[in-house]
Regions:
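Catalytic cofactor-binding cores of redox enzymes
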Residues: 10-11, 60, 145-146
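Unusually extended, aromatic-enriched hydrophobic runs near protein termini
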Residues: 1, 25-32, 77-78, 84-89, ...
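Conserved phosphate- and dinucleotide-binding cores of soluble alpha/beta proteins
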Residues: 111-229
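N-terminal active-site beta-alpha-beta segment that forms phosphate/nucleotide-binding
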Residues: 25-107, 112-117
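N-terminal start-of-chain detector that recognizes signal peptides
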Residues: 14-18, 37-40, 88-91, 102-104, ...
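Charged, low-complexity, helix-prone segments enriched in Lys/Glu/Asp/Gln
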Residues: 14-28, 103-113, 174-177, 207
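Flexible, glycine/proline-enriched loop segments at strand-loop-helix junctions
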Residues: 19-20, 94-96, 149-156
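Generic N-terminal amphipathic, Lys/Arg-enriched alpha-helix
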Residues: 2-42
């Protein structure tokens, strides 16, 4: 058998390229975690999905009513089925076939649930959570109301600062989210934000959590995987 490393002088470096990339993302994530802690958030870095699931389940008390924000990240983790099997009431407004009136009730229930599960659009290296919403139930529930908030973000959502956070939201997250939702918006067609004034514009509420709000119990898990939009 031929030794491929003899054929290509960069073979080893090419093999290590993804490992090196992951190392850098982990360093950035860990720096963000330390900054979040300084800003009074409970924050933790975990390496993968299995560890993230375990941390989430360990932080949800027995019998807790659990609200779920509009988050692909939370669905990727696969914890909702487990929580239902454990007997938790789940407030999930993404359940197929829900009447519009029920969806509104569930969104309101997010504000008073025992535990609210969500992601965030961006986490800065300065320890801030940056979000843009269309309705505001997700951003609102992150700030005040639930007994506990668990925020989960992949390393792909770690950015340098607020400016980078909003640029990520406008240029990366929102075009994908609205296209996935099937909304007829300019960014869903072109992939670029034009700061539209469409009746269905998704960017209507912008919230920055600079520090953990008083009376709120917020846990932030940064996962060493690409998650969500």
């Amino acid at each position: 058998m031929k030794n491929r490393s003899n054929e290509n002088p960069y073979f080893t470096r090419l093999q290590n390229m993804e490992k090196t990339r992951r190392w850098l993302l982990e360093q950035r994530a860990r720096k963000a975690v330390e900054a979040l802690k300084k800003n009074a958030f409970d924050a933790l870095y975990v390496t993968g999905l299995e560890s993230a699931r375990a941390e989430i389940l360990n932080r949800i008390p027995e019998g807790a009513k659990v609200g779920v924000g509009g988050s692909m990240t939370i669905r990727q983790l696969g914890v909702l089925d487990t929580l239902e099997k454990q007997g938790h009431v789940i407030y999930d407004h993404w359940r197929p076939g829900l009447p519009e009136g029920d969806i509104l009730k569930i969104r309101k229930a997010h504000l008073t649930c025992d535990v609210f599960l969500t992601s965030t659009n961006a986490v800065t290296l300065e320890g801030e959570l940056v979000n843009t919403d269309g309705i505001g139930n997700r951003a609102g529930a992150m700030i005040f109301g639930p007994g506990r908030v668990i925020v989960v973000a992949g390393v792909n959502k770690v950015v340098d600062d607020r400016e980078s956070a909003f640029r990520r939201i406008k240029e990366i997250a929102t075009p994908q989210v609205v296209r996935d939702m099937g909304l007829e918006l300019p960014c869903a067609v072109t992939g670029f934000c034009v700061d539209c004034n469409s009746p269905m514009r998704a960017c209507r509420v912008a919230v920055i959590l600079e520090r953990k709000p008083f009376l709120s119990d917020i846990h932030v898990l940064i996962v060493g995987e690409d998650l969500g939009f």
